Amino acid sequence: MSVASSSKSKKMDNVNNKEEKIYEKWECFHNWVHCICIVTFDLELGQAIEAIYPGHIMLSEQERSNVCYLAFPDSNSGCMGDTQYHVRIRQNGAVVQDTKALKEYDRRSPPFLQCDKDYYWGYVYFRQVKDKSLPRGYFQKSIVIITKLPFVNLFGELCALIAPEFFEVGSAVMEAIVREIDQWPPPVPGQIVHLPLIGVLFQTYIPNQNYKSTVPTIAAIDHAPNFHATRRLILTSAYEGDMFRSLASVVSYVHLLWELVLLSEPIVVMAGSPTGCSEMVQALIAMIAPLKYCADQRPYFTIHDSEFKEYTTDAPSPPAVILGVTNPFFAKTLQHWPHIIRISNGSSNENQKYKIKKSENLKVLDSKPGVYTQYKPFLQKDKTILKKLFRGIQTKRPGEVQTALLKRHLIELTESFMIPLERYIATLMPLQKDISPFKATPIPELFNPDDFFATLSSAGPQLTTGIKGDWVGLYRRFFRSPNFSGWFHTRYTELSQKLQVIQLEALSQADLKTWVQGKQEVELVDMVLRIRQKLEKTYIDEVPIGKSVKEKLQERINDITHTLPDDLKDILNHES
């Protein structure tokens, strides 16, 4: 390496270290928010970032470009007034380490609510109003909250509070906002959080891995610490939107759509506004909860996105992604996609929305709302739930009740599909009696589809659902999807870590004083190094191992080293 390049490298390291220290200073803020961007329309530059709060945050050029284009509706002439929606932005700048609180959040939250190391969520509030004092005659500006957390409901409400206040008061209020967020408690799964912000107290519940456990009641939330707030906003869910409202126009095809999302099929949602398409994409992803959607999703996607070419290629098989779009250009560019959902632009009443047809011929794709696909579902519809939902429309049942009915049905359907898989994967664990403290850590057996199918006759979905159909065919397709790969990788990792813990616990209780008798020095040294290696691996893999087990393992190491000559003791102590 030359002197110049070495000097440059050291400078870069110093810059990175400085940024990390500043980031740590704002750790409480970054538990919730990466940054807040103000995006404006510049006559010479077009969309441009006017300011980033806090000021130390550096976005890469590509991240800045994506934020700018996603912050404004694609064809904003029809979006007068205020427009809210959310986006997903690929992270490609400097690697930002999650805070300790976010790492702990990921460990304790359900998989479908965990952070994604490769993406940010962006929550957008766009305002366009006439203003004759400005050169173009319009005021156009967006506030974008960028975060790792998928709390669509909470951040939507935060955006709705922050943006109008900023438009009214200016940068001074934004400085106050970031300081106040920096005082918030961390997002702890299983707890109610109280988040004060410019006179409003937001209260909501952060779900834990037992996502079906009873959420604390409003009465429990009512006992909040004393905050100086002019009003309180209680959110029964931090992450759930109004599922039924989003899916109302296509509710007849809810089981077909559930299969498409489950199988990670390419879907494009075409709508007249970013709000409509982002809400629909969110509702589709939520259909398979508690299973995590592991393919890509873009609640709102534009022709300027850095992945535009990647997703609009003429390849025979489009990528596994759900795209939400508004630009009419996509109607032609993506017409070869196998599954297209068109959402009505108008505010037609519910009864009209439910007359949307399904087309079997993609060539007739036009402006009519509907589900355009040639996909043939593996399972039959559950007519009982559809009748309930249609009856609810006729009787004007409240939307939140309709959403609760639909959500419960879809969760039960997903669980009926996944329980046989969960039951089977548990059988891949070696028997505890076969786990020896003196041998290599065993690994789970490999997944065998034929062995799994053999379990279905006695322990298949029919135990928990009355829905008929080709369940085996659905499983076969599922095994080729990113959703299966993601689920299996997570479960296999959990089983492997569990085996590590079981073996280390056995090793910590083993009688090594007896074991050392008759052993060669090389065997004893090897055992010490292996125990240390196992401990180091648990640290790297973040395996949850108790403090007492670690202490006992150190005692076992001491049991061995006490029998070794002093020169070997010194070498081992030096290496530890």
Task: Describe the role of every protein-language-model region.
Residues 2-576:
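Acidic, Ser/Thr/Pro/Gly-enriched alpha-helical scaffold modules and adjacent low-complexity linkers
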